[in-house]
């Protein structure tokens, strides 16, 4: 289970180092690798342990291909999905097309989101977080379904 926020860097070759805590969390999955794809809603990447991704892909494969919204989602998620390995130093080489989509430069923010990680440009994440914390966004959170959550 992934949680927490982590600041990391990308080297000149496009490799991102996973913090030790996240490597430990990933090791619990006993998978040979990870899958990284784009987020169809935000300018970030989604990193899944291989076994978690396979469950998602099974659901995506069952969507009706003649439904435009389903096809769009399949193209975005599966079309950009890339199998990657974590090297012995705990680094992942992020492909250039994925880095370009998420506007990743040298400084990244990794957010634990349960069964997946979100990989953001630090600048993009800070702007998004400020937007989430704005008064209008906070008022949007006050829906009936959110009232059942106690923090």
Swiss-Prot record:
**Per its UniProt record, what InterPro entries does this chain match?**
MraZ, MraZ_C, MraZ_dom, MraZ_N, MraZ_sf, SpoVT-AbrB_dom, SpoVT-AbrB_sf
User: Is Repressor a UniProt keyword of this protein?
Assistant: no
Keyword Transcription annotated: yes
List the protein's name. Answer: Transcriptional regulator MraZ
Please state where this protein is localized: Cytoplasm, Nucleoid
- GO MF annotation terms: DNA-binding transcription factor activity; transcription cis-regulatory region binding
- What organism is recorded for this protein? Marinomonas sp. (strain MWYL1)
Q: What is its quaternary makeup?
A: Forms oligomers.
The record's comment on protein family reads:
Belongs to the MraZ family.
Alphabetized UniProt keyword annotations: Cytoplasm, DNA-binding, Repeat, Transcription, Transcription regulation
Q: State the HAMAP family in the record.
A: MraZ (MF_01008)
List the NCBIfam families hit by this protein, alphabetically: division/cell wall cluster transcriptional repressor MraZ (TIGR00242)
- Per the record, what is one GO cellular component? nucleoid
Q: Per the UniProt entry, what are the Gene Ontology biological process annotations, in alphabetical order?
A: negative regulation of DNA-templated transcription initiation
Where does the record place the SpoVT-AbrB domain? Answer: 5-52, 81-124
Gene that produces this protein:
mraZ
Q: Name one Pfam family in it.
A: MraZ
């Amino acid at each position: 289970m992934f949680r927490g926020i982590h600041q990391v860097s990308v080297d000149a070759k496009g490799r991102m180092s996973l913090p030790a805590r996240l490597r430990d969390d990933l090791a619990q999955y006993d998978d040979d690798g990870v899958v990284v794809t784009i987020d169809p809603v935000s300018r970030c990447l989604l990193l899944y342990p291989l076994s978690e991704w396979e469950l998602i892909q099974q659901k995506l494969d069952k969507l009706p291909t003649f439904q435009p919204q389903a096809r769009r989602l399949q193209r975005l998620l599966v079309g950009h999905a890339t199998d990657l390995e974590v090297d012995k130093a705990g680094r992942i080489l992020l492909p250039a097309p994925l880095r370009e989509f998420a506007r990743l430069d040298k400084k990244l923010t990794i957010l634990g989101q349960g069964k997946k990680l979100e990989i953001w440009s630090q600048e993009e994440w800070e702007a998004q977080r400020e937007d989430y914390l704005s008064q209008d966004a906070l008022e949007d959170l006050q829906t009936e379904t959110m009232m059942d959550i106690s923090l």
